[in-house]
């Protein structure tokens, strides 16, 4: 039985005051929520502060990126060992902003996936097509290629306990969102694609939707059978909006 997971990706936003205030408000808004796992991914600078602010709550600490190296002369990087040491659990990799701005390849992202698994951390593998690829009918081809970078090097078993976040690039931060039916079709394709290698693993892998998820569209998205939660950007910076999304996931999956 898959459990829903809603994760907030704070991106390049935050301050000490903001972290303390947002986490305190999240604790209030999410008190009593038990049917949906909740994670937040602040900038690395604020991971320790967020961890202490969330102590004693059900909020799980995550991070936005990881390096493929565990230590050494790699200026500016953060290793899986460091993230594990500070208490982060869910680690985002392959986000379209990393793929675009930092030219991260499918193969490089697959190496990050492997490093996280080796350290006992949970990869949140972001996949998704650009607007041009979508218009060219290449959505499934792109998603399959991005998944295959892991499947072909680590096997289907690598996805056991992992998370995939389908984020159509054309919907991130644009206000556009795939319709629930469109998102469900891609999520089903992703699950079926993994099932070709291992049906049992495919059935349990959590597949989140990410792409302008907000308080108004969350409930309908979560009624879809293969949408197991959300990776939330802008709305995760507002406790009330984020809480609506979490509660929508909880309600939909308990129905």
UniProtKB/Swiss-Prot annotation:
Reaction catalysis annotation: D-glyceraldehyde 3-phosphate = dihydroxyacetone phosphate
Residue positions of the active site: 95 (electrophile), 167 (proton acceptor)
GO-annotated cellular components: cytosol
Any one Pfam family match given in the protein's UniProt record, by short name: TIM
InterPro entries named among the record's database cross-references: Aldolase_TIM (IPR013785), TIM_sf (IPR035990), TrioseP_Isoase_bac/euk (IPR022896), Triosephosphate_isomerase (IPR000652), Triosephosphate_isomerase_AS (IPR020861)
Top-level division of the source organism's lineage: Bacteria
Disulfide bonding pattern of the chain: none
Disulfide bond found in the keyword field: no
MF terms (GO), sorted A to Z: triose-phosphate isomerase activity
UniProt record similarity statement: Belongs to the triosephosphate isomerase family.
Function: Involved in the gluconeogenesis. Catalyzes stereospecifically the conversion of dihydroxyacetone phosphate (DHAP) to D-glyceraldehyde-3-phosphate (G3P).
Protein name (Swiss-Prot/TrEMBL): Triosephosphate isomerase
Phylogenetic placement of the source organism: Bacteria, Pseudomonadati, Pseudomonadota, Gammaproteobacteria, Enterobacterales
Gene for this chain: tpiA
């Amino acid at each position: 039985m898959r459990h829903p997971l809603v994760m907030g990706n704070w991106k390049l936003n935050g301050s000490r005051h903001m972290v303390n205030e947002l986490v305190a408000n999240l604790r209030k808004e999410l008190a009593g929520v038990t049917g949906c796992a909740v994670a937040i991914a602040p900038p690395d600078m604020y991971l320790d502060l967020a961890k202490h602010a969330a102590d004693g709550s059900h909020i799980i600490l995550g991070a936005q990126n990881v390096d493929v190296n565990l230590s050494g002369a790699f200026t500016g990087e953060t290793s899986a060992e460091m993230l594990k040491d500070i208490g982060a659990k869910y680690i985002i990799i392959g986000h379209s902003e990393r793929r675009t701005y930092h030219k991260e390849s499918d193969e490089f992202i697959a190496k990050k996936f492997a490093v996280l698994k080796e350290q006992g951390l949970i990869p949140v593998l972001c996949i998704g097509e650009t607007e041009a690829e979508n218009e060219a009918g290449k959505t499934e081809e792109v998603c399959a290629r991005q998944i295959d970078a892991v499947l072909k090097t680590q096997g289907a078993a690598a996805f056991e306990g992992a998370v995939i976040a389908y984020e159509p690039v054309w919907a991130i931060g644009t206000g556009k969102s795939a319709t629930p039916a469109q998102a469900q079709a891609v999520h089903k394709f992703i699950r079926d694609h993994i099932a070709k290698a291992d049906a049992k693993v495919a059935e349990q892998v959590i597949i989140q939707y990410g792409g302008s998820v907000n308080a108004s569209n969350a409930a309908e998205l979560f009624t879809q059978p293969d949408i197991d939660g959300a990776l939330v950007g802008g709305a995760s910076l507002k406790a009330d909006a984020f809480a609506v999304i979490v509660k929508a996931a909880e309600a939909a999956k308990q129905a």
